């Protein structure tokens, strides 16, 4: 309001000026000022953004580990940041409050998935569960997943499979103990996780599925490709560069491997007569084929749809499980006093028994705290699977355009000093008598996501991880290969993929525990 008197005073002074040519100039400047105000008032109020470069936008700020780069940028630009990666508008959320607003208040608007070169090729036009567009098809396939494939009852039905495969793992480690040599624990954990998952999904172990053992390489190949930078996604006119980088040929080759692999699995299941089997003994492929055959679904489940869903179970279940186990064992090596306390708990609960059962796991409270703390520091997917806004909205006081890609920086939220005391330290006790859990309701701790797009395989994965971890701690002591090495010196560098697995394999010396 104070501007108006000043303007009136200036206007009266003009009449005293004899040099009248100044008047048109004043009107011109006034017009330009008003035009600028009108134009600026029509601009959307976008979130803060780091300076971008012509054409590439903010791509140069991604770094080799985007979750770490985004965390550093959020300290300057705040918990809601806006980027342009090529032509693609992108939102990055780095606080629990904003994650809550996104996944609760505006969950539907944020529930879509962007189409990308890798997901479209690998997942049969994004007709799986994780990357399919939000809508009726996604609701139906998620319903199948939750009720038929990953229900608590179904997960419990695979307990025998978990026990048998873990027993094989323990026997392998026990045999290696006699040699007193270092073992590649990462390799053994990957093999074990893969065997458990493929038996549940396909009814066979990894090497038995294709007869060559090549399938064991596929999960991490897929995870790396899903996180790879394809020029086509950000600069459609530069898609040819993907041929030069090698990503496009690698994508084509991997898609061919996957398709042949899945076709073989599905055809084998179709020719096998398993109708007489008990429902709880059937694997995921059996269940999906039965649903397809009986016409019990509200939509047509095509051959490609079926393969896409199986691929989700196969790749997602295998890689996230082994990655989680690698990180928790690495943290225990770095924190020997915590490992000792965990071993004492596990061995006390198991007692003189020769085998750990599921009821024992339920009594291992400290082990569960250790797993939570490891998931806090090392979420399997540090930068959430991207979402996409289905329409424009107000979010955190900002204007967010439709078709904006959205990432939640889970890694940054779970290391936020405003939420966690000594956030960079491994302190399992922080979860003792603490109701905070990883089911997606506490947004300071969302290693498996939250809202409609939260991970449906959480129960399955946790059951495997807890059982494997309890066995590794019960029957063995562990140390680094070098006698003089300190746990704190263990390299903890991660690799950029959809799942952030260790850059270097975890090699340890197992020592058979004598009770």
Predicted segments, located by residue:
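Cytochrome P450 substrate-recognition site 1
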Residues: 43-59, 68-161, 165, 185, ...
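Conserved cytochrome P450 K-helix/beta-meander segment immediately N-terminal to the heme-binding cysteine loop
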Residues: 392, 408-436
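Conserved cytochrome P450 K-helix E-x-x-R motif and the immediately C-terminal K′/meander segment
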Residues: 59-78, 257-260, 357-397, 417, ...
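Terminal signal-anchor or tail-anchor transmembrane helices
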Residues: 2-42, 195, 463
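Cytochrome P450 heme-thiolate "Cys pocket" and heme-binding signature region
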Residues: 311, 434-465, 493-496
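Cytochrome P450 heme-thiolate monooxygenase catalytic core
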Residues: 114-122, 156-325, 341, 358-359, ...
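Cytochrome P450 heme-binding "Cys pocket" and the immediately downstream C-terminal segment
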Residues: 336, 458-499
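C-terminal helix/juxtamembrane-tail motif
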Residues: 1-15, 26, 290, 498-515
């Amino acid at each position: 309001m104070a501007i108006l008197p000043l303007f009136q005073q200036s206007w009266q002074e003009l009449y005293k000026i004899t040099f009248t040519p100044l008047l048109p100039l004043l009107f011109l400047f006034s017009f330009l000022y008003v035009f600028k105000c009108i134009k600026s008032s029509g601009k959307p109020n976008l979130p803060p953004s780091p300076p971008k470069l012509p054409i590439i936008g903010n791509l140069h700020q991604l770094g080799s580990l985007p979750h770490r780069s985004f965390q550093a940028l959020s300290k300057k630009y705040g918990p809601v940041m806006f980027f342009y990666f090529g032509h693609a508008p992108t939102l990055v959320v780095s606080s629990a409050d904003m994650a809550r607003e996104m996944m609760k208040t505006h969950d539907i608007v944020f529930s879509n998935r962007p189409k990308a070169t890798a997901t479209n090729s690998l997942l049969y036009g994004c007709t799986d569960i994780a990357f399919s567009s939000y809508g009726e098809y996604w609701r139906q396939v998620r319903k199948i997943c939750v009720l038929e494939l990953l229900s608590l009852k179904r997960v419990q039905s695979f307990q025998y499979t978990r026990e048998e495969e873990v027993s094989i793992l323990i026997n392998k480690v026990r045999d290696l103990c006699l040699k007193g040599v270092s073992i590649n624990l990462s390799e053994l954990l990957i093999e074990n996780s893969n065997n458990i998952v493929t038996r549940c999904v396909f009814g066979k172990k990894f090497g038995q599925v294709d007869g060559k053992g090549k399938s064991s390489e596929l999960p991490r190949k897929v995870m790396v490709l899903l996180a790879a930078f394809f020029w086509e996604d950000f600069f459609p006119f530069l898609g040819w560069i993907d041929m030069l980088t090698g990503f496009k040929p690698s994508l084509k080759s991997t898609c061919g491997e996957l398709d042949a692999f899945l076709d073989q699995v599905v055809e084998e299941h179709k020719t096998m007569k398993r109708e007489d089997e008990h429902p709880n003994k059937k694997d995921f492929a059996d269940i999906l084929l039965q649903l397809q055959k009986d016409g019990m679904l509200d939509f047509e489940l095509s051959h490609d749809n079926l393969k896409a869903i199986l691929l989700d179970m196969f790749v997602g279940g295998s890689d996230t499980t082994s990655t989680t186990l690698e990180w928790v064992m690495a943290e225990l090596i770095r924190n020997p006093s915590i490992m000792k306390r965990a071993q004492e708990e596990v061995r006390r609960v198991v007692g003189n028994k020769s085998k750990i059962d599921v009821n024992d796991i339920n009594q291992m409270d400290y082990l569960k705290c250790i797993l939570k703390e490891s998931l806090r520091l090392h979420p399997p997917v540090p930068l959430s699977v991207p979402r996409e806004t289905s329409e424009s909205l107000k979010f955190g006081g900002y204007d967010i355009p439709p078709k904006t890609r959205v990432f939640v920086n889970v890694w940054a939220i779970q290391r936020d000093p405003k939420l966690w005391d000594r956030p960079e330290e491994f302190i399992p006790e922080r979860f003792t008598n603490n109701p905070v859990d990883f089911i997606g309701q506490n947004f300071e701790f969302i290693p498996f996501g939250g809202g409609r797009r939260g991970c449906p395989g959480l129960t399955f994965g946790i059951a495997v991880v807890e059982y494997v971890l309890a066995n590794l701690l019960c029957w063995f002591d562990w140390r680094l290969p070098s006698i003089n090495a300190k746990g704190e010196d263990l390299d903890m560098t991660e690799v950029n993929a959809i799942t952030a697995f260790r850059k270097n394999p975890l090699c340890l010396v197992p020592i058979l525990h004598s009770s």
